[in-house]
Design a protein with these regions (language model features):
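Phosphate-group recognition and catalysis centered on beta-loop-alpha active-site segments
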Residues: 1-142
Length: 142
């Protein structure tokens, strides 16, 4: 099972570091994939959950693409990032990623081989067999 760090967090949320490129690189360096939040504003890619915080280029994304799961925060980002592992949603119970995986938000749905975000809960009690889990606590899952 793949473990995906939520915005670069490894040992719990650190809001001021989330989506920071160096923080993301640290999570990748520790062996995790990372879910990041990306938006496109005036032709420029930005990392940041609620607002654009860190400007990045494709030259930063490209060498990390096999480790990144890009949550596209707007339609422009979805169009720009379709070559990467990416997905978009607002309040949907599930969404498909560009790699064909189901990113499942409604945990009452039982789907094997899906990606399950257990952001706030470091303890897992799952009936299904997920492809991956996205969490702020990846170190607890090793």
């Amino acid at each position: 099972m793949k473990i995906i760090s939520h915005r670069g967090n490894i040992r719990g949320p650190i809001l001021e570091k989330e989506n920071r490129p160096s923080y993301i690189d640290c999570a990748i360096g520790n062996g995790y994939d990372v879910e990041i939040d990306v938006r496109l504003i005036d032709g420029q890619l930005w990392l940041g959950h609620d607002e654009p915080q860190y400007k990045v280029e494709h030259s930063w994304l490209q060498p990390r693409k096999e480790y990144l799961w890009i949550h596209c925060k707007d339609l422009a980002a979805a169009q720009e990032c379709c070559e990467y592992q990416s997905f978009c949603h607002t309040s949907d119970p599930y969404t498909y990623t560009t790699t064909g995986k189901v990113w499942l938000h409604d945990l009452s749905m039982k789907v094997n081989d899906a990606i399950i975000p257990l952001i706030d809960d470091p303890i897992i009690h799952l009936a299904q067999k997920p492809y991956a889990i996205c969490t702020d606590y990846p170190y607890l899952l090793n």
